[in-house]
Amino acid sequence: MKLFLILGTLLAALSVALGAFGAHGLKKLVDAETISIYQTGVQYQMYHALALIIVGILAQRNDNSLLSYASFFFIGGIVCFSGSLYLLSSFRAMNKTVPGFVYPITPLGGILFILGWLLLLFALIKK
């Protein structure tokens, strides 16, 4: 589906920009552990942006609702997993206490990623 191709390319471009910010701007504000956490968010965003592009290509060739569901799980995973790591890094950069709600969002995002990959697998098997 074209929407997933567009979102995938936008999220990939955003991950490059966020990675550059982490390497050049954020590095001046936080410790190495926080940079590592931030970069994990960037990496997983890029992996799953590329997965969205792949699913978008597959969806153009196959009418399979599982592909759409996989994409929504990948997007939700990016928002929850990478987004929570960006939030955590931002609070640390501002020398603020990280709110407790941020921590459980990260594993939720990881679960969404896993479900997205499993849905993609089922879509490929169903084909």
Where are these regions (language model features)?
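Polytopic transmembrane helical bundles with strong interfacial aromatic enrichment
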Residues: M1-K127
